[in-house]
Amino acid sequence: MARYVDIHPVNPQPRLVDQVVAVLRDDGLIAYPTDSGYALGIQLGNRAGLDRMRAIRHLDDKHHFTLVCRDFAQLGSFVHIDNAIFRTVKAATPGPYTFILPATSEVPRRLMAPKKRSVGVRIPDHTLVQALLEALGEPLISTTLLLPGDVEPMTQGWLIKDELDQVLDAVIEGEAGSLPTTVVDFTSGLPEISRYGAGDPTRFE
């Protein structure tokens, strides 16, 4: 049964944030609100959590998960990013974008796209998520909470608790966007839109 945690969206209570961090550090799987709908999240070393996320979303082993980072200092440990791309990405973050970039050796091999050795990263514009990432001290491995047959991510914590109570360890109630991220692939050196979503794509076209 999932723990239901109602955290203030503007002033997240540290005690409640720490409760969620404890779940993550115990290899738990959480559902949490972001600026692009709800997402599933686990800590970096949680191998079993990857399989649990795949099972919930009916994903195959080729699905690429995202590293949700607190800031550029953290993001820079996991991807290679040159000055020109850095300026472009920085102008769009924090925000509802996922950027595909070449992975560093800090990225677990199971998270890399095998042919390109790349990984998706993002910095969300969401106070609650920022508080969670600060307390955790590392990125979350994450995927949009988009259930099989749905076209948009789930946006209500209590509905997620009701529907996925037996397969999650915690659900955070909070404000969430209604569209998934816009995905921008920089692995060729130039931006290519892989998915249109909440973020304005015109700055990359």
Model-derived features: positions:
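Active-site-adjacent structural elements in enzyme catalytic cores
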Residues: M1-E205
